[in-house]
Protein backbone atom coordinates (compact mmCIF):
# COMPACT_ATOMS: atom_id res chain seq x y z
CA UNK A 1 0.00 0.00 0.00
CA UNK A 2 1.13 3.58 -0.45
CA UNK A 3 0.74 6.69 1.68
CA UNK A 4 -0.57 7.10 5.21
CA UNK A 5 -3.91 5.81 6.35
CA UNK A 6 -6.57 8.40 7.21
CA UNK A 7 -7.45 7.67 10.83
CA UNK A 8 -10.97 8.84 11.64
CA UNK A 9 -13.12 7.94 14.63
CA UNK A 10 -11.89 5.74 17.42
CA UNK A 11 -12.00 1.99 17.75
CA UNK A 12 -13.96 1.02 14.65
CA UNK A 13 -15.00 -2.63 14.97
CA UNK A 14 -15.54 -4.12 11.48
CA UNK A 15 -16.80 -7.56 12.44
CA UNK A 16 -17.19 -10.60 10.25
CA UNK A 17 -20.22 -9.33 8.33
CA UNK A 18 -18.72 -5.89 7.63
CA UNK A 19 -15.36 -7.32 6.55
CA UNK A 20 -17.06 -9.86 4.32
CA UNK A 21 -19.29 -7.23 2.68
CA UNK A 22 -16.35 -4.95 1.91
CA UNK A 23 -14.31 -7.86 0.53
CA UNK A 24 -17.21 -8.93 -1.69
CA UNK A 25 -17.24 -5.49 -3.30
CA UNK A 26 -13.49 -5.58 -4.02
CA UNK A 27 -12.45 -7.19 -7.34
CA UNK A 28 -10.07 -10.14 -7.13
CA UNK A 29 -7.64 -8.22 -9.34
CA UNK A 30 -7.42 -5.50 -6.69
CA UNK A 31 -6.89 -8.04 -3.91
CA UNK A 32 -4.05 -9.61 -5.91
CA UNK A 33 -2.58 -6.14 -6.37
CA UNK A 34 -2.60 -5.63 -2.58
CA UNK A 35 -0.56 -8.82 -2.18
CA UNK A 36 1.82 -7.93 -4.99
CA UNK A 37 2.49 -4.37 -3.82
CA UNK A 38 3.05 -5.46 -0.21
CA UNK A 39 5.60 -8.08 -1.28
CA UNK A 40 7.43 -5.62 -3.52
CA UNK A 41 7.63 -3.11 -0.65
CA UNK A 42 8.41 -5.70 2.01
CA UNK A 43 11.61 -3.94 3.10
CA UNK A 44 9.50 -0.98 4.22
CA UNK A 45 7.78 -3.05 6.91
CA UNK A 46 9.06 -4.05 10.33
CA UNK A 47 8.23 -7.74 10.29
CA UNK A 48 9.31 -10.01 13.16
CA UNK A 49 8.81 -13.74 12.53
CA UNK A 50 5.41 -14.95 13.70
CA UNK A 51 5.22 -16.49 17.16
CA UNK A 52 3.80 -20.02 17.02
CA UNK A 53 2.40 -21.38 20.29
CA UNK A 54 1.63 -25.10 20.28
CA UNK A 55 -1.19 -26.56 22.38
CA UNK A 56 -2.59 -30.03 22.88
CA UNK A 57 -4.13 -32.12 20.09
CA UNK A 58 -2.70 -30.00 17.30
CA UNK A 59 -4.33 -26.76 18.48
CA UNK A 60 -2.22 -23.62 18.29
CA UNK A 61 -2.01 -19.83 18.33
CA UNK A 62 -0.05 -17.61 15.97
CA UNK A 63 0.83 -14.08 17.10
CA UNK A 64 1.81 -11.80 14.22
CA UNK A 65 3.01 -8.19 14.75
CA UNK A 66 3.93 -5.73 12.01
CA UNK A 67 4.63 -2.01 11.59
CA UNK A 68 4.41 0.11 8.43
CA UNK A 69 5.87 3.48 9.41
CA UNK A 70 5.20 5.10 6.04
CA UNK A 71 1.50 4.40 6.47
CA UNK A 72 1.51 5.22 10.21
CA UNK A 73 0.11 1.77 10.99
CA UNK A 74 1.02 -0.84 13.57
CA UNK A 75 -0.81 -4.14 13.73
CA UNK A 76 -0.95 -7.33 15.71
CA UNK A 77 -3.00 -10.39 14.84
CA UNK A 78 -3.84 -13.22 17.23
CA UNK A 79 -5.20 -16.24 15.42
CA UNK A 80 -5.49 -19.90 16.29
CA UNK A 81 -6.91 -23.21 15.27
CA UNK A 82 -8.87 -25.10 17.91
CA UNK A 83 -10.93 -28.24 17.54
CA UNK A 84 -14.64 -27.61 17.90
CA UNK A 85 -16.12 -28.98 21.11
CA UNK A 86 -19.52 -30.60 21.25
CA UNK A 87 -22.29 -28.02 21.07
CA UNK A 88 -20.07 -25.16 19.90
CA UNK A 89 -21.12 -23.01 16.96
CA UNK A 90 -17.94 -21.45 15.59
CA UNK A 91 -15.17 -21.83 13.06
CA UNK A 92 -12.16 -23.95 13.97
CA UNK A 93 -10.04 -20.92 13.02
CA UNK A 94 -10.63 -17.82 15.15
CA UNK A 95 -8.68 -14.58 15.09
CA UNK A 96 -8.68 -10.85 15.75
CA UNK A 97 -6.66 -7.93 14.42
CA UNK A 98 -5.74 -4.75 16.30
CA UNK A 99 -4.75 -1.67 14.28
CA UNK A 100 -2.84 1.21 15.90
CA UNK A 101 -1.47 4.58 14.90
CA UNK A 102 2.20 3.72 14.83
CA UNK A 103 3.38 7.18 15.92
CA UNK A 104 1.07 7.47 18.96
CA UNK A 105 0.20 3.91 19.99
CA UNK A 106 -3.52 4.77 19.92
CA UNK A 107 -5.78 1.82 19.14
CA UNK A 108 -7.87 2.57 16.05
CA UNK A 109 -9.61 -0.67 15.21
CA UNK A 110 -10.50 -4.12 16.44
CA UNK A 111 -11.31 -6.26 13.41
CA UNK A 112 -12.33 -9.79 12.56
CA UNK A 113 -9.06 -11.54 11.73
CA UNK A 114 -10.40 -14.91 10.64
CA UNK A 115 -12.04 -13.71 7.44
CA UNK A 116 -9.11 -11.44 6.55
CA UNK A 117 -6.73 -14.37 7.08
CA UNK A 118 -8.81 -16.62 4.84
CA UNK A 119 -8.98 -13.93 2.18
CA UNK A 120 -5.33 -12.91 2.10
CA UNK A 121 -4.15 -16.53 2.30
CA UNK A 122 -6.18 -17.58 -0.72
CA UNK A 123 -5.22 -14.48 -2.67
CA UNK A 124 -1.52 -14.96 -1.86
CA UNK A 125 -1.69 -18.50 -3.21
CA UNK A 126 -3.39 -17.27 -6.39
CA UNK A 127 -0.66 -14.63 -6.79
CA UNK A 128 2.05 -17.29 -6.48
CA UNK A 129 0.23 -19.59 -8.88
CA UNK A 130 0.22 -16.85 -11.54
CA UNK A 131 3.87 -16.06 -10.86
CA UNK A 132 5.39 -19.56 -10.87
CA UNK A 133 3.14 -21.88 -12.88
CA UNK A 134 4.49 -22.82 -16.31
CA UNK A 135 2.96 -20.52 -18.96
CA UNK A 136 1.43 -23.36 -20.99
CA UNK A 137 -0.36 -25.01 -18.06
CA UNK A 138 -3.62 -26.84 -18.65
CA UNK A 139 -4.41 -28.94 -15.58
CA UNK A 140 -4.77 -27.87 -11.95
CA UNK A 141 -5.14 -30.33 -9.06
CA UNK A 142 -6.94 -29.06 -5.96
CA UNK A 143 -6.94 -30.66 -2.50
CA UNK A 144 -8.87 -29.20 0.43
CA UNK A 145 -11.85 -27.46 -1.11
CA UNK A 146 -12.83 -25.13 1.72
CA UNK A 147 -12.99 -21.35 1.92
CA UNK A 148 -9.29 -20.68 1.33
CA UNK A 149 -9.28 -22.80 -1.81
CA UNK A 150 -12.50 -21.16 -3.01
CA UNK A 151 -10.85 -17.73 -2.74
CA UNK A 152 -7.65 -18.97 -4.35
CA UNK A 153 -9.02 -20.70 -7.44
CA UNK A 154 -11.68 -18.03 -8.00
CA UNK A 155 -9.00 -15.32 -8.03
CA UNK A 156 -6.61 -17.42 -10.12
CA UNK A 157 -9.12 -18.02 -12.92
CA UNK A 158 -10.52 -14.48 -12.67
CA UNK A 159 -7.04 -13.01 -13.16
CA UNK A 160 -6.56 -15.09 -16.30
CA UNK A 161 -9.89 -14.02 -17.75
CA UNK A 162 -9.27 -10.37 -16.86
CA UNK A 163 -6.17 -10.51 -19.07
CA UNK A 164 -8.15 -11.99 -21.96
CA UNK A 165 -6.77 -15.51 -21.46
CA UNK A 166 -9.66 -17.82 -22.39
CA UNK A 167 -7.69 -21.05 -22.43
CA UNK A 168 -9.30 -24.33 -21.42
CA UNK A 169 -8.42 -25.19 -17.82
CA UNK A 170 -9.11 -28.57 -16.25
CA UNK A 171 -9.62 -28.61 -12.48
CA UNK A 172 -9.07 -31.99 -10.81
CA UNK A 173 -11.05 -32.06 -7.57
CA UNK A 174 -10.86 -34.56 -4.73
CA UNK A 175 -14.29 -35.81 -3.69
CA UNK A 176 -15.00 -34.91 -0.06
CA UNK A 177 -18.42 -34.30 1.50
CA UNK A 178 -19.65 -32.75 -1.77
CA UNK A 179 -17.25 -29.81 -1.33
CA UNK A 180 -16.33 -30.24 -4.98
CA UNK A 181 -19.77 -28.98 -5.99
CA UNK A 182 -19.05 -25.55 -4.52
CA UNK A 183 -15.96 -25.20 -6.72
CA UNK A 184 -17.89 -26.38 -9.75
CA UNK A 185 -20.64 -23.86 -9.07
CA UNK A 186 -18.08 -21.02 -9.10
CA UNK A 187 -17.44 -21.59 -12.79
CA UNK A 188 -20.83 -22.60 -14.11
CA UNK A 189 -20.76 -19.54 -16.40
CA UNK A 190 -17.27 -20.30 -17.78
CA UNK A 191 -17.47 -22.93 -20.54
CA UNK A 192 -13.67 -23.19 -20.68
CA UNK A 193 -13.29 -24.53 -17.15
CA UNK A 194 -13.65 -28.31 -17.03
CA UNK A 195 -13.70 -30.75 -14.12
CA UNK A 196 -12.37 -34.19 -13.28
CA UNK A 197 -13.61 -35.65 -9.99
CA UNK A 198 -11.05 -37.83 -8.22
CA UNK A 199 -11.19 -40.35 -5.40
CA UNK A 200 -7.47 -40.46 -4.56
CA UNK A 201 -4.65 -37.97 -4.13
CA UNK A 202 -2.71 -39.85 -6.78
CA UNK A 203 -5.42 -39.04 -9.32
CA UNK A 204 -5.46 -35.37 -8.35
CA UNK A 205 -1.69 -34.83 -8.38
CA UNK A 206 -0.60 -37.15 -11.17
CA UNK A 207 -0.34 -35.23 -14.45
CA UNK A 208 -1.26 -31.84 -12.95
CA UNK A 209 0.74 -28.78 -14.00
CA UNK A 210 -0.27 -26.94 -10.83
CA UNK A 211 -1.15 -28.55 -7.49
CA UNK A 212 -2.67 -26.49 -4.68
CA UNK A 213 -3.50 -27.91 -1.25
CA UNK A 214 -5.40 -26.12 1.49
CA UNK A 215 -5.80 -28.97 3.97
CA UNK A 216 -5.04 -27.66 7.47
CA UNK A 217 -4.05 -30.91 9.19
CA UNK A 218 -1.92 -33.58 7.51
CA UNK A 219 0.18 -36.31 9.13
CA UNK A 220 1.91 -37.79 6.07
CA UNK A 221 2.82 -36.98 2.49
CA UNK A 222 -0.03 -37.11 -0.01
CA UNK A 223 1.78 -39.13 -2.70
CA UNK A 224 5.19 -40.53 -3.58
CA UNK A 225 7.67 -38.71 -5.79
CA UNK A 226 6.76 -40.21 -9.15
CA UNK A 227 3.34 -38.53 -9.22
CA UNK A 228 4.83 -35.05 -9.61
CA UNK A 229 5.26 -34.41 -13.33
CA UNK A 230 8.14 -32.46 -14.80
CA UNK A 231 7.44 -28.75 -14.77
CA UNK A 232 4.76 -28.87 -12.08
CA UNK A 233 4.26 -26.17 -9.46
CA UNK A 234 3.12 -27.20 -5.98
CA UNK A 235 1.60 -24.70 -3.54
CA UNK A 236 0.89 -26.23 -0.11
CA UNK A 237 -1.08 -23.32 1.35
CA UNK A 238 -0.87 -24.78 4.85
CA UNK A 239 2.72 -26.03 4.19
CA UNK A 240 1.93 -29.69 4.95
CA UNK A 241 1.76 -32.93 2.99
CA UNK A 242 4.64 -32.39 0.58
CA UNK A 243 7.82 -32.92 2.63
CA UNK A 244 9.11 -35.38 0.04
CA UNK A 245 9.11 -32.52 -2.47
CA UNK A 246 11.63 -30.71 -0.24
CA UNK A 247 14.19 -33.33 -1.19
CA UNK A 248 14.00 -33.37 -4.98
CA UNK A 249 12.22 -30.30 -6.37
CA UNK A 250 14.40 -27.96 -8.43
CA UNK A 251 13.34 -24.62 -6.96
CA UNK A 252 11.64 -23.41 -3.77
CA UNK A 253 10.11 -19.95 -3.31
CA UNK A 254 8.90 -18.43 -0.05
CA UNK A 255 7.29 -15.26 1.23
CA UNK A 256 9.70 -15.15 4.19
CA UNK A 257 12.86 -17.24 4.54
CA UNK A 258 13.12 -16.80 8.32
CA UNK A 259 9.75 -18.43 8.92
CA UNK A 260 10.63 -21.71 7.19
CA UNK A 261 14.07 -22.25 8.73
CA UNK A 262 12.53 -24.67 11.20
CA UNK A 263 11.23 -26.99 8.47
CA UNK A 264 12.64 -30.50 8.75
CA UNK A 265 14.51 -30.44 5.45
CA UNK A 266 15.32 -26.73 5.29
CA UNK A 267 19.08 -27.29 5.15
CA UNK A 268 18.56 -29.52 2.12
CA UNK A 269 16.42 -27.15 0.06
CA UNK A 270 17.87 -23.84 1.32
CA UNK A 271 20.42 -23.61 -1.54
CA UNK A 272 17.60 -23.56 -4.12
CA UNK A 273 15.28 -21.28 -2.14
CA UNK A 274 14.44 -17.70 -3.11
CA UNK A 275 12.27 -15.00 -1.53
CA UNK A 276 9.28 -14.08 -3.71
CA UNK A 277 10.07 -10.41 -3.07
CA UNK A 278 13.42 -10.81 -4.83
CA UNK A 279 11.69 -12.26 -7.88
CA UNK A 280 9.14 -9.43 -8.03
CA UNK A 281 11.84 -6.77 -7.70
CA UNK A 282 14.09 -8.34 -10.34
CA UNK A 283 16.85 -9.35 -7.93
CA UNK A 284 16.44 -13.08 -8.64
CA UNK A 285 14.87 -15.19 -11.39
CA UNK A 286 11.57 -16.99 -10.99
CA UNK A 287 10.68 -19.96 -13.18
CA UNK A 288 13.28 -20.18 -15.96
CA UNK A 289 11.98 -23.14 -17.98
CA UNK A 290 9.04 -25.53 -18.31
CA UNK A 291 10.72 -28.56 -16.75
CA UNK A 292 11.58 -27.18 -13.30
CA UNK A 293 9.55 -28.64 -10.46
CA UNK A 294 8.73 -25.67 -8.22
CA UNK A 295 7.54 -25.64 -4.61
CA UNK A 296 6.06 -22.48 -3.07
CA UNK A 297 5.93 -22.08 0.72
CA UNK A 298 3.84 -19.05 1.63
CA UNK A 299 3.96 -19.44 5.39
CA UNK A 300 1.87 -16.31 5.87
CA UNK A 301 3.29 -12.90 6.69
CA UNK A 302 1.76 -10.11 8.71
CA UNK A 303 2.28 -7.46 6.04
CA UNK A 304 -0.64 -8.97 4.15
CA UNK A 305 -2.85 -8.91 7.23
CA UNK A 306 -1.91 -5.27 7.77
CA UNK A 307 -2.53 -4.25 4.15
CA UNK A 308 -5.87 -6.05 3.90
CA UNK A 309 -7.01 -4.75 7.30
CA UNK A 310 -5.97 -1.17 6.52
CA UNK A 311 -7.70 -1.17 3.14
CA UNK A 312 -10.86 -2.64 4.64
CA UNK A 313 -10.70 -0.08 7.48
CA UNK A 314 -10.59 2.71 4.90
CA UNK A 315 -13.77 1.36 3.31
CA UNK A 316 -15.65 0.62 6.55
CA UNK A 317 -18.88 2.50 7.23
CA UNK A 318 -19.90 0.77 10.45
CA UNK A 319 -20.58 3.06 13.46
CA UNK A 320 -17.62 4.03 15.62
CA UNK A 321 -17.31 2.63 19.12
CA UNK A 322 -15.67 5.14 21.50
CA UNK A 323 -12.42 3.94 23.03
CA UNK A 324 -11.59 5.93 26.15
CA UNK A 325 -7.85 5.65 26.64
CA UNK A 326 -6.09 7.68 29.35
CA UNK A 327 -5.52 11.28 28.20
CA UNK A 328 -3.49 12.52 31.13
CA UNK A 329 -0.65 11.36 33.30
CA UNK A 330 -1.72 9.59 36.47
CA UNK A 331 -0.20 8.04 39.57
CA UNK A 332 -1.23 4.85 41.31
Predicted features along the sequence, with ranges:
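Glycine-rich adenosine-cofactor-binding loop
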Residues: 125, 136-159, 174-179
